[in-house]
Amino acid sequence: QGLARRESRRMRGRDVCLLWSDEATAARWAHSVASNPRIKDFSLTEMLASVLPGLAQHRRLVGLDWLGDEVIVELDPMDFAERLRIACLDAFVRSVEKMDAVFTIEGPYGPALLRSQTKPEGLVLPCWANPGEAYSRLEGPWREMLVIKTPLSDFIGERLAWLSRKGHLVGPDYQDGPG
């Protein structure tokens, strides 16, 4: 049970949990590391809030896109988490600069906020660079809310200042469904 893993070839006494970026590749190699494999797709939030911290807690490493021989890349899970955060933030910033706007969801009482999964006492403002992503979240408790387009200069000058005063976080390109 759990994630597929192999013994680390670089760090004695440590296991490497195998993760793939492509479902077809994972399915192709799953039978060589497990007797009854099941492919599980993790969201970015699950990876950052649960999977990678759990691997770190159990002193396991991350092996990326294993193709049957020696695990070429073995990463510390928290280092990998930080790399994921930086890559996602970079992509978000590039998209926002291109659109010159940020999209949020708001109702009659202000912006939609969520509980942070990485900082339990914090609230997060989910926002998107792509309006289609924001509109796709208008279901469940958010179905009566509106997608709001905020010019980038206003988002930086006003919205980020408001979030800072309130002690709230920003959730760029939030991907885990409706509120």
What are these model-predicted stretches?
Residues 1-179:
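Conserved NAD+-utilizing ADP-ribose enzyme module
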